[in-house]
Amino acid sequence: MKRASHFGMITALALSSAVFVDDATADERVISHDELMDKMSGFWIGQLLGNYIGFPFENNYVEEPIPVLVDRVYTADYAGSPELKINSKDRRGFIPLMAETLGGAFSDDDTDIEFVTLHAVEKYGLDITYPEITQMWKTHINDYIWVANREARNLMDRGLVAPDTGRKENNKHWFQIDPQLVNEIWSAFYPGMTQKAAERALWGARITNDDWGTHPTIAYGAMISAAFFEKDVRKLVDIGIKAVPNQGPFAEGIRDVVKWHSEFDNWRDTRDKIHEKYYAYKKGSYEAPVSVVSSLANGLTGIMAVLYGEGDFMKTVGIATSAGYDCDNQAATTAGLIGVLNGLSGMGEAAVKLTMELPLRSTWDKPFNDRYVNISRDEIKLRTPISEIVERIGAVAKTAILENGGRMEVRDGKTVYVVNSDL
């Protein structure tokens, strides 16, 4: 059975038969309902904030990183020192104005394709098929997409169905960053089930990408899933390494980043190494395509940010942004990861303050005014409470936990989930 009502049936069944048992076994991890939802909030709100911190600098810094450690949402009217290259011709340079006008967070491809995936999984189930997701893309995803996503969507109009839309022979952008930034939600669906999260993230990546162009998506898929229970960022990166096929430039690069992290105290030295070797990667007769939005250099700077950020939200997102390239994507992905690791409650005062002070003339009393405004996806309602989105992601996760050997219990009067984890 795999229809929308499946989630409600599973959850209701578990609630009506909650049991009391002793501690979980070695392969099981226990998380309370409250902690799970706090981490889901950190995941979604973290991605939003990371996106907005990185957005003003998207694609502006390539040869060198940004000369400051970005710690705020910059705007096009910035006139401080040092001089910074900020996008000034579109919404990327006017985020507070956009947020104030719309009354909350607004959609961008760092979250809105995941939002479509949420709708798709609610409609078809966790075992959604490629023909079904292709139809969801054709219905909801038509504008505000670029490179591999744009090419895949064009191919759908020509009659191709995923994963043919991501194959090298069909999609000339198969190596670009697109799948990393649109598939993190699979990790939230599978907390602590890193293999399932990575498998489904890869499934999603193949809609647009192929070969090593899917490898960063796999790594982050496993890492974000693991972050529900693992707080050591080095261990998270090791989990990402193990999830990725042991061939290709990203597999080589992620090991290099770990090595450089052990050699250099300053992340800027590691960024120099990444740019030198992986921006225009060559090995033997093989030359990787060169692009400011390639999954290779971008994916590696995200790993760098996770290591040097040491679990601190603002430090991690600051490094991910300041590293340059297509930096809003790394900022959003790593923000979602650290948001899971620490939960919204552990995101830190500076980060939470930013989510409530984006408007120009007022202050919200909840992150992003508890409002997600859809300005980019067709046939999805305009405004959705962020708290509702978080609850809906959590409902899918509960279903995944129960369908994969986990269970729901009541301990000391509180609901907990016992996850059949592979950590």
Question: Model features per residue range: what roles?
Answer:
Residues M1-M9:
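Bacterial N-terminal signal peptides that target proteins for export
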Residues G8-A18:
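Bacterial N-terminal signal peptides
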Residues V21-A26:
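Boundary at the C-terminal end of the N-terminal hydrophobic targeting segment
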Residues E28-I31, L155-W174, N183-T194, L202-T208, ...:
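Accessory "access/gating" subregions that flank catalytic or transport cores
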Residues I45, L102-D210, T214-T217, F229:
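Active-site cavity-forming subdomains of large catalytic enzyme subunits
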Residues L49, I53, N60-A76, N209-W212, ...:
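Catalytic phosphate/nucleotide-handling subdomain of diverse soluble enzymes
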Residues F55-M98, T111-I113, T134, Y144-W146:
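Active-site-surrounding "flap" and adjacent substrate/cofactor-binding loops of secreted or lumenal enzymes
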Residues A251-I254, V258-A288, L344-L423:
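Acidic, carboxylate-rich catalytic segments that either coordinate divalent cations
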